[in-house]
């Protein structure tokens, strides 16, 4: 009995700390310090949720920028099935998939240069990457400009406005969030 009392006390104390106090503290701090991120980094358009900034979406229409291919298994950009393709660089299946993606992109973007940016044909490690390089966005600019009947310079300006550079710069490369860029295109034509 003398050993049971401290054991029960510790179980109750740790349950209180880890089950109530710690979650309340971290939630309160997150809401105070990072409210946008703590609530899912949601991107809104006219009061409606259009997506979450850190999760990519599938865009197939000619008047929208396309992101990186998704490696999620059942449907593109499914956050519940996040994974990479796990295909080695020497795997013939990866070579075939990339070749098919290059052919499809060249067919959809006949006015673009011959060199297809690598991030448009390879999936990210998570399969959910929402960003592409500015070069990949510029590569698609002619198609977007033609489909939306906009001057190419307007499309390039939108790409520049939606390009983010990490601070400090040595922590990564400039990137463009595809969903944010497509929402900016929609807002421009309202």
From Swiss-Prot:
Does the keyword Ligase belong to this entry?
Answer: no
The GO terms this record gives for MF are:
ATP binding; P-type potassium transmembrane transporter activity
Chief localization class? membrane
GO terms under cellular component: plasma membrane
What's the domain of life for this entry? Bacteria
> Where is the chain membrane-spanning?
6-26
Q: Which UniProt keywords apply?
A: ATP-binding, Cell inner membrane, Cell membrane, Ion transport, Membrane, Nucleotide-binding, Potassium, Potassium transport, Transmembrane, Transmembrane helix, Transport
One Pfam family cited in the UniProt record for this chain: KdpC
- Positions with biased composition (Polar residues): 69-88
Locations listed in the record: Cell inner membrane
Q: Where is this region: Disordered?
A: 67-88
Topology versus the membrane = Single-pass membrane protein
Q: Which PANTHER family match?
A: POTASSIUM-TRANSPORTING ATPASE C CHAIN, POTASSIUM-TRANSPORTING ATPASE KDPC SUBUNIT
| Similarity section | Belongs to the KdpC family.
The record's function comment reads: Part of the high-affinity ATP-driven potassium transport (or Kdp) system, which catalyzes the hydrolysis of ATP coupled with the electrogenic transport of potassium into the cytoplasm. This subunit acts as a catalytic chaperone that increases the ATP-binding affinity of the ATP-hydrolyzing subunit KdpB by the formation of a transient KdpB/KdpC/ATP ternary complex.
Self-association and partners: The system is composed of three essential subunits: KdpA, KdpB and KdpC.
- Protein name from the UniProt record: Potassium-transporting ATPase KdpC subunit
UniProt source species? Erwinia tasmaniensis (strain DSM 17950 / CFBP 7177 / CIP 109463 / NCPPB 4357 / Et1/99)
Whichever gene encodes this chain, its name is kdpC
């Amino acid at each position: 009995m003398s050993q049971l009392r401290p054991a029960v006390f510790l179980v109750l104390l740790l349950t209180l700390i880890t089950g109530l106090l710690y979650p309340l503290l971290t939630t309160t701090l997150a809401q105070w310090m990072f409210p946008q991120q703590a609530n899912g980094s949601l991107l809104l358009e006219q009061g409606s949720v259009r997506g979450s900034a850190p999760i990519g979406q599938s865009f197939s229409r000619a008047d929208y920028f396309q992101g990186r291919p998704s490696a999620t298994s059942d449907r593109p950009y499914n956050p519940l099935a996040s994974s990479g393709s796990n295909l080695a660089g020497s795997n013939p299946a990866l070579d075939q998939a990339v070749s098919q993606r290059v052919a499809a992109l060249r067919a959809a973007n006949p006015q673009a240069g011959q060199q297809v940016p690598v991030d448009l044909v390879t999936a990210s490690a998570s399969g959910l990457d929402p960003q592409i390089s500015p070069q990949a966005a510029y590569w698609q600019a002619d198609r977007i400009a033609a489909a939306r009947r906009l001057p190419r310079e307007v499309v390039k300006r939108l790409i520049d406005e939606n390009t983010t550079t990490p601070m400090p710069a040595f922590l990564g490369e400039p990137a463009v969030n595809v969903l944010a860029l497509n929402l900016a295109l929609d807002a421009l034509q309202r």
